[in-house]
Amino acid sequence: MKIEAITGSEAEAFHRMGSQASHRYDEFVDLLVGAGIADGQTVVDLCCGSGELEVILSSRFPSLNLVGVDLSEDMVRIAREYAAEQGKALEFRHGDAQLLAGMEDLAGKADLVVSRNAFHRLTRLPAAFDTMLRLAKPGGAVLNCSFIHPSDFDESGFRAWVTFLNQRPWDSEMQIVWALAHHYAPRLDDYREALAQAARETPVSEQRVWIDDQGYGVPTVKCFARRAAA
């Protein structure tokens, strides 16, 4: 069982957690810097949730052209409201990361296409990576960070996961949601094959998939690729 859209009270709960723990985005922002993010670029965030990353990036890189896309209309609404509260004029759209529909105007134009802690919820992982690569311009990069199945953790990673699960300041419902997100998450090899499959349709000059716990405290999978130059 996988739920693609986060709606209602669950969407509100995810926003509360994200807005109260902005430091947990530091690692991902560092990865974006390593991928070459810079002012003036176009950046598309698939499965953007309630917009915390967009607010953070727009503060650090004021002239970014940011577009957040999420399947949940509730998340898009929350993201727009949150950005306005923070004094940010940001664009958020309703759309499915597994389809290019609604994002055709961005195809081949993004310097960087990103997604954070969301692809483990999707039912068509290769299609999501295909969307990322099709949105990227030639020479542009894609970067995804997602949960992995606990069977891919080593002993220290599993201990870190249990500690994180027990120590987060959330209610029992969100604790269960977070645990189930890992239970239904893809394996490391699933991510590798999904990215490789997408790269067969849209050629890349480099691709890499790895696991680490840098910054977040729990092992996550990182998937990076750069679309081949024209």
Swiss-Prot record:
Keywords, in A-Z order: Antibiotic biosynthesis, Methyltransferase, S-adenosyl-L-methionine, Transferase
Pathway terms, separated by semicolons: Antibiotic biosynthesis; novobiocin biosynthesis
GO biological process: one example: methylation
Source domain of life: Bacteria
EC top class, as a word: transferase
Pfam families to which the protein is assigned, alphabetical: Methyltransf_25 (PF13649)
UniProt keyword annotation of S-adenosyl-L-methionine present: yes
EC number(s) given by UniProt: 2.1.1.284
MF GO annotations: 8-demethylnovobiocic acid C8-methyltransferase activity; methyltransferase activity
InterPro entries for this protein: Methyltransf_25, SAM-dependent_MTases_sf
Gene3D superfamilies hit by this protein: Vaccinia Virus protein VP39 (3.40.50.150)
Reaction(s) catalysed by this chain's protein: 8-desmethylnovobiocic acid + S-adenosyl-L-methionine = novobiocic acid + S-adenosyl-L-homocysteine + H(+)
Stated role: C-methyltransferase that methylates 8-demethylnovobiocic acid to produce novobiocic acid in the novobiocin biosynthesis pathway. Novobiocin is an aminocoumarin family antibiotic that targets bacterial DNA gyrases.
Protein family (similarity comment): Belongs to the methyltransferase superfamily.
Protein name: 8-demethylnovobiocic acid C(8)-methyltransferase
Gene: novO
